[in-house]
Amino acid sequence: MIDQKIFETTLNIDDPTNFCTNVEAHLLKELENIYVGKCFKNSFILNITGVIQRSPCFIMRTNNSGRGYMHVRFSAVVSYLNAFDLIAAVKIIKNDSNIILGESLLTEPVTIVIPSSESQNNVAEVGQIVPVQLANSSVYYIPGRQQASATGSIFIPKHTFSVYHVQEELTQEQALNLTKLVNIIEMLLESRSKKDFKQICFFEKLYYTYSISSDEILDLKIWKGPKGKEMSRLKPCNVLSFLYDALKNKSSSLGFWARPPNLLKSSPLAYQQDQNSFNATELPIICSAEVMFVTLLKEIINYLQFMNDLCDTFNNEQLIKRHENIWMLIEQRKIGHDF
């Protein structure tokens, strides 16, 4: 994720006399030299956007070095990864009996370790590009390093899903706060509309939870899965339209919400029920409407970005064909696959 953060630090100044001849210029240059292109406080700093606050240049009195120091608050554009993030393009750089190592081609520099216990060790070849999901609490940003490190695995379609029990209505103010995430989804959908339709179909079918025969077609315009996979008696709602109605107090968020496997993962759809009849493996999560919608919207964003990145990375038939072993691994983990 790209974001802007504010940091506080103390800079050591070797030549205070020269530094103070043009503090602003020297300070910005020093910050860029130390932090840009490196890890710092759980982020990878892309560029410094400004100095917010600084102290005077103090002279060290604990020795006779003549050096100085300055306390600084600065803002920076950063990139950072979270647990369970999806990365569409990780190039395998090492694969032996002990470990798989890959480097992300899309995010900040990060080395990803796929544990040797994973069955995909015998599938991915050095030089191939694989889609990866990061593990829980697995991203490490060691200060000063020029790349982060993480653990993960080749991303396989998920069979499980969560059910959320909402007992209080979403307020207009909360709905307004969610429009930033809605805008991101609309931007990603616009980007998706400009991509090759055959590629979108290929990857949507690849990551659909159920095994799909060649004569079954996904309707990507109305976000429905193949015939026979829809949930009976239930009609999904478009979360984006729902939130626009919530701004006008025209929708009720009470009840049970879920995005089960029959929906395309990058669709903006979800199911809402008065009584819970979802066939989930875990008990419903009781939470506020705002927390539930933030969770659903972020999931939609992650999958949409993931699908767009897959289309951009594997942008020709030859490249897709060279990775058939990876697609076969993914297909074998689907519900309904004949082993």
From Swiss-Prot:
Signal peptide: none annotated. Induction: Expressed in the early phase of the viral replicative cycle. Its main location: host cell. GO terms for biological process: viral transcription. It is found in: Host cytoplasm; Virion. Keywords: DNA-directed RNA polymerase, Early protein, Host cytoplasm, Transcription, Viral transcription, Virion. It comes from the Viruses. Transmembrane segments: none annotated. GO terms for cellular component: DNA-directed RNA polymerase complex; host cell cytoplasm; virion component. Component of the DNA-directed RNA polymerase (RNAP) that catalyzes the transcription in the cytoplasm of viral DNA into RNA using the four ribonucleoside triphosphates as substrates. Part of the viral DNA-directed RNA polymerase that consists of 8 polII-like subunits (RPB1, RPB2, RPB3, RPB5, RPB6, RPB7, RPB9, RPB10), a capping enzyme and a termination factor. Belongs to the Asfivirus DNA-directed RNA polymerase RPB7 homolog family. Contains an extended C-terminus, with no homology to characterized proteins. This is DNA-directed RNA polymerase RPB7 homolog. It comes from African swine fever virus (strain Badajoz 1971 Vero-adapted) (Ba71V). The lineage of its organism: Viruses, Varidnaviria, Bamfordvirae, Nucleocytoviricota, Pokkesviricetes.
